[in-house]
Structure formats: C-alpha cells, structure tokens
C-alpha cells in the first residue's frame, strides 16, 4: 500500500510490533486517534478473508487501556448465524466500520506497562476465532 498515513506517533514498542507483524498500518486522527491495520486476516468462515482492523487509542494511552475493534468491510458469518454485539458502526476516514463490542474482563484486565497494541491484537485474533465456538 502506498501513502500510509502517520498522523500521530505511537510508542516505540507499538511501532516495532506493527512493523514486525508485517501488515500495512497507519495512524489517523478522525475525531479520535486510530490505528488502522490493513489486510488483517479473519477466518475462512467469514465473508471477507481480509479486512482493515481499526483500534481506537483512548486519551492517555498506553496508561489508558484499549477496548473493542472495528472492521471494514463489515464481517458476517458464512453460516448465516448472527455475530453478537456488532450492530454499531463508526465512520473512520470516510469508511463505515463495523464495531465489535468486546471488552477485557476482571480476569484479564489492562495492565499498564505490560499491555499494548500487540497484546490487544492477540485478543482481536482470539475474538475472531472464538466467535465460532458459541
């Protein structure tokens, strides 16, 4: 991809993780600070094998935790079963992203100094896979 936006700087550890992750990524400011990860692999049981995943960085990140994920284009299961808590949408850079309302739990809280974009992406990958366990 060409012309990847870098509208704000990420902490060094996040930049290193994203570069090593190997997918095109960018940062953009559109009401909030967003990290967009392109060509993000889903699962063959979704309607799109690759999407753009968006992560909103809350004010105070990395002390403030990351939450949820947004996908473009929107995902549906190919077996026709609904995906719970995905009804919300968010316009980011003139595209309508599907919000996946997923949250950390008291058993898996955000830990300052340990959690970052990399650990959040691991959760996103897990959310995509676990969708088919229900």
Give, region by region, the residue ranges found by the protein language model.
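Proline-anchored loop/turn motifs at beta-strand termini and strand-loop-strand connectors
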Residues: 54-62
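Strand-helix-loop interaction patch of compact alpha/beta domains
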Residues: 2-49
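Short, solvent-exposed secondary-structure capping/transition elements
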Residues: 47, 62-66
């Amino acid at each position: 991809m060409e012309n990847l936006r870098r509208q704000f700087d990420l902490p060094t550890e996040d930049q290193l993780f994203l570069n090593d992750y190997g997918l095109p990524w960018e940062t953009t400011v559109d009401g909030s600070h967003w990290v967009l990860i392109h060509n993000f692999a889903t699962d063959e049981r979704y309607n799109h094998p690759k999407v753009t995943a968006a992560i909103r960085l809350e004010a105070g990140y990395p002390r403030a935790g990351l939450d949820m994920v947004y996908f473009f284009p929107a995902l549906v299961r190919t077996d026709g079963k609904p995906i719970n808590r995905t009804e919300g949408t968010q316009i980011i850079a003139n595209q309508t992203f599907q919000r996946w309302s997923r949250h950390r739990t008291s058993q898996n809280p955000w830990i300052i100094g340990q959690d970052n974009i990399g650990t959040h992406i691991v959760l996103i990958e897990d959310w995509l896979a676990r969708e088919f366990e229900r």
